[in-house]
Each structure stands twice: as C-alpha cells, then as structure tokens.
C-alpha cells in the first residue's frame, strides 16, 4: 500500500531534503525513523528537494508498506521519535500510482525578510535593513509571469531536462517590519527562488531597471542575475494535488 505523509521542518540543521552520503538530510532522518518504527526498510520520496538550510511549513512525501498501517498511531509515534525540528501532521493512504513529486500541480514558496533586527527571527528570516522600493519590486515580479525559461535564475551546471517553469503568481507584501515574497509555479529550478529574490532586491535598490530585469530573464545567463539571498529566509509553504482538493 502507498501512503502520503504531510510534514514540516526547520531546515537549519539539515543539508537539504535529499539524502546526502556524508551529511544529515530530512529524507534520511525520516527513512530511519519509519524503518525503525515499522521494522522494515522504508524509502520515502519527497515532493521536492529543498536546499541546505531551507525550511518547509508544508511538505508531502510518499512511501510504500506491505501491510495496512494504523496511521493515527504512527503519526504520534513518529513525532515522539523524530527530532524537534521535524513535525508530522498526517499520514493517509493513496492509490498505488500516486506520486508525491510527479503529481504535484503547484508549489508555493515564501521568502521572509525582516527589516528590523529581531533575535527571535535569527535563522528564520533574512535581516536586511536597507530601504527597498517594494512597489517597483512588485512591478518586476509581475514580469516573471510573462516568461517560462528561467535558466538565468538556475544554479549553474544543474542536471535538468528543461529550464521551463510556469509561474502562476509572484508578489511582495509588507507585514509590520517584515517583507514577504510569495511565488507559485508548477515547478522550480535549483536555487531559483533565492536568485529571483536577490535580483528583485537589486530592483528595489534601484541598481537595475525593469527593462534590465526583463533582459536578464531573456539572457538565460546566471551571471547577469543578482546574488542568491541566504537560504534561512526561504520556506516551502504549499504543495497542491488535483486529488487532495
């Protein structure tokens, strides 16, 4: 039987979601916990691959079990067994053909910036105190929706078949002393959101114009785009599936 698992994690202590041979990952931590509790080897497949230090307030993964599971009890056992920076919200059966990664229709990320130094946001938001033209940054963000090839924002030498992504929404909002960028797409490239945010910050600083921003996208050249903002401000916040509406 196949099961979906819904979880969240603080990514500070992990070298991303995906298994790393010489470093701690969220996937490996979950595999070990499930394998111990179910007394069999479990290999979970995540809906995405967050990078080192990136957080997730919603992540889905799937795994297979030869026997029917008592899911409510398993959720409690996992939360007791796992470290405090990983929380399990739900485990539920799905069809054997369901796939947490390939069936996802939309993914949403948020990037958090705090403009006032706050020790309680350390490691959870990027502290950046320079004044930013948020209205202009939102104009630039809208331009993303006019394009599909985002090679300029992708990590160099990444192993992908295509740089095409369909962006559904991209917007900045102010909340007290915080700026939050929300972006939704059918898929994302490695380092894509962080390099988009860094380039939009350059727009907000008036270092580049709206035309410059659009020309960067058209260039397909990572060197022309802005810096990658720190990972600790990035959150995977929502994953959508047609059959989980």
In which residue ranges do the predicted regions lie?
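Structured-RNA-binding interfaces characteristic of tRNA pseudouridine synthases
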Residues: 1-245
């Amino acid at each position: 039987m196949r099961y979906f698992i819904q979880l969240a994690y603080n990514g500070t202590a992990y070298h991303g979601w995906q298994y790393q041979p010489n470093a701690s990952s969220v996937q490996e931590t979950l595999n070990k916990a499930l394998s111990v509790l179910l007394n069999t080897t479990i290999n979970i497949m995540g809906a995405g691959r967050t990078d080192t230090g990136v957080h997730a307030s919603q992540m889905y993964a799937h795994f297979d079990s030869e026997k029917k599971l008592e899911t409510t009890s398993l959720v409690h056992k996992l939360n007791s067994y796992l470290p405090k920076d990983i929380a399990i919200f739900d485990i539920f059966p799905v069809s054997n053909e369901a796939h947490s990664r390939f069936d996802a229709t939309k993914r949403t990320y948020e990037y958090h910036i705090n403009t006032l130094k706050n020790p309680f946001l350390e490691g959870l938001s990027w502290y950046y105190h320079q004044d930013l033209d948020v209205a202009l940054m939102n104009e630039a963000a809208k331009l993303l929706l006019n394009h599909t090839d985002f090679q300029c924002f992708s990590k160099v030498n990444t192993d992908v078949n295509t740089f095409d992504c369909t962006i559904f929404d991209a917007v900045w909002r102010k909340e007290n002393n915080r700026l939050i960028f929300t972006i939704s797409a059918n898929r994302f490239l490695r380092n894509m959101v962080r390099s988009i945010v860094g380039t939009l910050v350059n727009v907000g600083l008036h270092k580049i114009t709206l035309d410059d921003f659009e020309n960067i996208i058209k260039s397909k050249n990572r060197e022309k785009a802005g810096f990658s903002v720190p990972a600790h401000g990035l959150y995977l916040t929502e994953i959508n599936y047609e059959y989980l509406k």
